[in-house]
Amino acid sequence: PKELPNSENVTYVTVDFAHQSLTERLLNAGFDRTKSTVFTLEGVTQYISKEAFNSTMKEMSRLCQKTSSIFALSFVNELLNKNPEDCFGRGYLNPEKKANLIKKLSAKAAGEPWISFYSTEEIEGLLSENGYSIKENVTLEDLNSLYFGPVGRTLSENEIFKLEHFVIAESKE
């Protein structure tokens, strides 16, 4: 969006993670390896294979060897498949049914099913192996008390989805 401050410094790059090289797509879009970079991969990790995500992390790490980078991503917790009750707030009715509905609707809306789910430890490991350290890892439950509570819009426990994590990681220096 042009109304963003410093939008001239923002480049959106599309990539088919299964068939294209992220490095090639970024370099073709004018990526400058000498400048600090913020990468954003929100709503992507659940749609691509774990191998594609790991490969993406490796490419970003190699691209930014000579400078710093920040990586923002979201991931869907593996508990959605393993224990849906833990992904929803206390008192949430029929969590298994809701988990299946969410996966079904996301596949229909995006035209692709969710195929990759992660534990926090797995994401931390992948980031660490590729030169990043997590600075923040939050769920809607965390954001509820931080942002909604102070303005009187706190979500009740049975309205909270804890399935998606929002992560900020920074390249290790």
Feature map (PLM): residue ranges:
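Alpha-helical subdomain
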Residues: 1-173
